[in-house]
């Protein structure tokens, strides 16, 4: 009888254990080991950063907003309001094996506001795009030795209502994506506004036949080797309810990729709102494969990357274990992915396998990110990473050979 009871207990214990997801796993098939780590509190940009990159969070004061956000309450495109909040999830972390170290050499101006994007020009200058309250500059240029050499005034580019992606083109022009402002702006190397796509605060559809050239939540931008411009649109889980709008210029209500030539002339666009292979709920990351010209789309809330050809044909889906927040290719042509609130930057192969990781997870400590965001590589392979929710830029220093 005692043996039977023991056997039943062991069987029940084994059955229970089989239903509990593992909290860690070994490295295999070229990927590092992984483990789960809890989430951290998001300070939403209300931080003070000292000269060592240490962060102090200060209380949020009502009315002290760094951008004018919209609330999503009704549309089917909103994030699932009945499931667990993303800020309560345990997060997959990958063991760091590549030997990168963390530095904080860029001193942003005092005050609130996270810098979601960093970009590097051909001369090694570092551009930083920051969320700030109206009346403050939001675009800064630093020399390769991290000295501030240019501040672009609000009088030039206007207030950027919710900065997201930024990219530097082959001529060292800087392109800015303001999702709530509904614009993409092209800024010269010396800080002059050259061109604006979209209409300020008029979210809508690009309809070339009507001469209607509006943007819908422009969030990320990338360039093909021939100079073609790809603008990713659709921060779906945070959209206002304009998909139920009566505005005849705004009827699609879906994430999309807009392709223009190097002069800004319309080529095509494709949408992600239908079910089936290659579709996407939102675009948070966007990158062009320099070897093939393929378009990599980070469909963040669905934990996947959708790969399309340069002319919009679906090629494959890559499922990820992390938020596919932002994407870029390094100097050797490898794809990398920042994992947002998972707090790392991952090196991938072209099948999406994780082959290396950098970052200590979600948080405000050394080597951590509240939300690792848009990033770029210098000529030595070091990586500059923006953080949407803390006022610092992290330099990931590549180990010397």
Residue spans of the language-model regions?
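Sequence-structural signature of mature extracellular/luminal beta-sheet repeat domains
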Residues: 18-401
């Amino acid at each position: 009888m005692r043996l039977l009871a023991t056997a039943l207990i062991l069987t029940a214990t084994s059955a229970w254990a089989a239903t509990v997801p593992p909290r860690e796993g070994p490295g295999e098939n070229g990927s590092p080991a992984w483990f789960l780590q809890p989430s951290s509190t998001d300070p939403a940009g209300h931080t003070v950063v000292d000269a060592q990159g240490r962060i102090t969070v200060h209380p949020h004061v009502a009315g002290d907003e760094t951008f004018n956000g919209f609330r999503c309450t009704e549309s089917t495109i909103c994030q699932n309001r009945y499931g667990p909040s993303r800020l309560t999830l345990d997060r997959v972390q990958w063991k760091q094996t590549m030997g990168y170290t963390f530095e904080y050499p860029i001193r942003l101006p005092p005050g609130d506001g996270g810098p979601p994007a960093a970009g590097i020009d051909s001369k090694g200058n570092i551009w930083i795009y920051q969320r700030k309250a109206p009346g403050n500059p939001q675009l800064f240029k630093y020399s390769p030795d991290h000295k501030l050499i240019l501040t672009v005034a609000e009088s030039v580019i206007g207030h950027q209502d919710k900065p997201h992606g930024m990219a530097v083109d082959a001529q060292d022009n800087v392109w800015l994506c303001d999702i709530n402002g509904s614009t993409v702006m092209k800024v010269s190397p010396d800080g002059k506004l050259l061109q604006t796509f979209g209409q300020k605060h008029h979210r809508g559809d690009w309809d070339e036949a009507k001469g209607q050239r509006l943007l819908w939540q422009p969030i990320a931008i990338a360039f093909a080797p021939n100079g073609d411009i790809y603008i990713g649109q659709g921060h779906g889980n945070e959209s206002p309810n304009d998909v139920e709008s009566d505005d005849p210029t705004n009827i699609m209500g879906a994430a999309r990729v807009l392709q223009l030539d190097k002069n800004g002339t319309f080529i095509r666009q494709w949408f992600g709102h239908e079910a089936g292979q290659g579709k996407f709920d939102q675009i948070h990351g966007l990158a062009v494969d320099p070897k093939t010209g393929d378009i990599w789309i980070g469909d963040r809330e669905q934990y996947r990357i959708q790969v399309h050809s340069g002319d919009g044909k679906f090629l494959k889906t890559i499922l990820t274990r992390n938020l596919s927040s932002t994407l870029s290719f390094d100097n050797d042509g490898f794809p990398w992915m920042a994992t947002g609130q998972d707090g790392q930057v991952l090196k991938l192969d072209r099948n999406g396998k994780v082959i290396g990781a950098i970052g200590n997870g979600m948080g405000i400590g050394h080597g951590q990110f509240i939300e690792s965001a848009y990033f770029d590589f210098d000529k030595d392979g070091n990586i500059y990473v923006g953080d949407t929710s803390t006022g610092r830029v992290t330099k990931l220093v590549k180990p010397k050979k």
